[in-house]
Curated annotation (Swiss-Prot):
Record bears the keyword Cell cycle: no
Function: Catalyzes the reversible conversion of 3-phosphohydroxypyruvate to phosphoserine and of 3-hydroxy-2-oxo-4-phosphonooxybutanoate to phosphohydroxythreonine.
Gene Ontology molecular-function annotations: O-phospho-L-serine:2-oxoglutarate aminotransferase activity; pyridoxal phosphate binding
Localization (cell): Cytoplasm
Native source organism of the sequence: Lactobacillus helveticus (strain DPC 4571)
UniProt gene name: serC
Positions annotated to bind L-glutamate: 41
Chain segments annotated as coiled-coil in the UniProt record: none
GO annotation terms (biological process): L-serine biosynthetic process
Annotated GO CC locations: cytoplasm
Name of this protein: Phosphoserine aminotransferase
Amino acid sequence: MTVYNFAAGPATLPDPVIKQIQEELPSLQGSGMSILEISHRSQMFDKIIDTAKQDIKDLMHVPDNYHILFFQGGGTGQFAAVPMNLATKHKRIALLDSGHWATRAGDEAANLGVTVDVLDSTKDKHYQELPHMPHAISASDYDYLHITTNNTIEGTAYHTLPEHGDVTLVGDLSSNFMAEEYQVSDFGLIFGGVQKNLGPAGVTVVIVRDDLVNHVDHIPSILNYELFVKKNSMFNTPPVFAIYATGLVLKWLKQQGGIAGIEALNKKKSALLYDFLDQSTLFHNDIKKTDRSLTNIPFKTTDPVLDKQVIAEADQAGLKNLKGHRSVGGLRASLYNAMPLAGVQALVDFLYNFEKQHKNNTMGKRYVSSKNI
């Protein structure tokens, strides 16, 4: 039985990458040493990290005035790092509240003494559509505007970025990093954990414009952008294996036609599932169609008990980790870059058959009930 992993992260990795890791694990490049034990100060790792940076630059067309950095601590770590490094002039930021992770980013900035102005929120609409800019803003008021480009839990995404005037735009791209195309130059800073689209858990990519990298007092060294630029992301021991594995995924991504190629596939995958859900009489997705995510698709029936049955039976069929986030319930299918089209087709086939069987069972019960009247 083929197993497909629909987890929100850590997520599925490309089969060729897993195979290469297996082959190289005992002895990396014939060195007699595993990637798990090589020194981060070795020439071998210098090549690994520099190649990964160059491949990110190539894939995302990163301009020369941006730095590519590797951190630990996930996107959550950057919720603290970004305001510490960037909110230094006004100590005030703007935020569009599109869901759980945007809220977490705002809370962390506020915890650090930064004033957070939530310009718009769709919380009252259960985050089933995106918030938008209610008015123009200025860099004379704000250090930056924070957005979450893809909302992993709620299933929405900014396919077109909000207008932000001369205010620096900070994007949390954690769950659609390299899953669809964005212009890096539209942002002052991009960050994202790689464990959804680009690699295993353990490394966070930060892409930051050079003019935003400044000396800041009273900031932990482990979150200091200036220090990480100077040390080529090796102020301390970096996550060697995670960077190595991410590098392999980047090579694989180039072979898929780059981000444009993988975005086309992601659109095809998501359309396959959305088309089924829109025609279904049992399952439904309540997200505004123009705001739907390519990578995270929540859906449910009208009965939480039935949702649990779907999840359990899907698991038995090899369709793993479809349980929705605890804050919204239901089911969620995460269709990250390495999820093959065949996996989505298998899910749709399963849901179709489940719905058909459910209808038959329901009609049978009604028939028996009517005979007893």
